[in-house]
Amino acid sequence: MRAASRRRATIVGAATLAVVVGATGVGVAQSGKTKGNIVADAGQLSRMEATKIARTIAGPKVIRSAAFAARPPYGRVAARSTKPLTGFPLSGPSYMILSNGNALFADDKNTGPAKGQNAGGPAIRGARDVTIFRMNIRVPKGRNCLDLRFRFLTEEFPEFVNEEFNDAFIAEVDQTTWDTRPVGDPSIEADRNFATDTKGNRISVNAVGDASVNAKRAKGTTYDGATRRLRASTRITPGGHRLYLSIFDQGDRQYDSAVFVDRLSFRKAAVCENGAVSDE
């Protein structure tokens, strides 16, 4: 389905992860480059651990709880990081990393064309290595606009720009309804997605405008390209809601992507347009 160069990917199995696993079973990426580390789950993430990860982007008054709506059986797909990377964290000491491979790879040196992990499991909605992270949130009174800051990073740059199948990041409120079409008619339907570029496309290596990908923005990470820091917004009502963040691969299980997420906030706005714009 992809170009032959896909075979160059370094695929890391569950038995060969380059991490240190402590008594709690939590993976920690070790690095002497800068202070901080990346702490990921041990594969079977509890609701308590998911909530800890979620609360890196907002406090307990906003993030009531969190869990996975879907996740692949292998790979450390979610992490809380105190390691400064690409301008994160934005506020507070930590931020969230979600991946469709292994979040612990984020600060590895970029020494090859690609580094990834086959996270396994069956296809979900036609996609592979699907991570769907669900947060139960509470919107304060008087606020009607949700803002979420993030940066999408990928190993698919530049080899797979303008390819039909790509990793993608999607953000939805209250329901997650995105779906993919099979090989032969490749497309993604995501009517509720509010993390889109200026043309309404999902965030991927093919995004345009403020959400376009280049190599410079991924400096200091294992990834070959990244977007600017973006702010995705959508209208919302006060009270309880669910926020779904999804990252997946539509075509293969090899070249992986991640999203750094921080600073979930709410404001009162006369106009609150769906979509992602530069936050730099």
Give the role of each language-model region.
Residues 2-30:
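Secretory targeting and sorting signals
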Residues 32-280:
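Aromatic (Trp/Tyr/Phe) and Gly/Pro-enriched flexible surface segments
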